Amino acid sequence: MHTITPTEALTRDLTPATIVDQVVAPEPPTKESTALHVTRRELNVLEGHRARITGRLLENGRPGSPGLMVVLQRRAARRWLTVVRSHTRGGGRFAINYLARTPRSESVRVRFPGDELASSSTRRVGRLNVFRAVEASWYGGGGSLACGGELTSSTLGVANKILPCGTLVDIRYGGRSVTVPVIDRGPFVAGREFDLTEATKDALGFAGTGVVWSTR
């Protein structure tokens, strides 16, 4: 489109109203608002298995179009990193499957990046906990802890031979989960990686020795 300059307007004897009529472009269309709704989440998984998130994308409060991209992002090093992409099906429904390979515990979210017709939207999902299976036992009886302090029946924590003192460990057993620090050294039995304190054992419903899931 050629824009009429004031000089040209004088030359052509055009009125100001005529100039405005020729240079005003149509306003761009307003983008549709969007929202993500999560209907199911499976975020506690063993390494080598898939985390799964299902939901629906809405556009202006109505089921979204098929074929729109929805991504899963994890929080790492103060940034959100996209780890897997999916696309909506009929009714704006989406399903994201993420193969979890490395033990970790991180915040995750789903995001619709937006396009030329619809605005972007984001929904926090929770924490993705990727576990590995480890042998564990429990101990009690009081005494001094290698990381400082005294062991009591209410002390929450674990003993480990190599993790630094204070390292937080997410442990899952029988559908229960706790996050506790490394407070002691041990266990000193071949094949075992963690000794749970009595309070940690009770919180998990763990008895004797056996396999627990750990994010470390």
Model-flagged regions — what are they?
Residues 115-119:
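Short, solvent-exposed loop/turn segments at the edges of extracellular beta-sandwich modules
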Residues 57-82:
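Short flexible loop/turn segments that cap and initiate beta-strands
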Residues 78-86, 178-179:
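Surface-exposed loop/edge segments in extracytoplasmic proteins
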Residues 19-23, 70, 83:
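Detector for intrinsically disordered, low-structure N-terminal pre-sequences
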Residues 47-61:
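Beta-strand-rich structural segments
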Residues 34:
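Nuclease and nuclease-like effector domains acting on nucleic acids or nucleotide cofactors
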Residues 2-30, 38, 44-46, 54, ...:
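Secreted/periplasmic proteins
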Residues 69-73, 84, 170-172, 181:
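Beta-strand signatures of extracellular beta-sandwich domains
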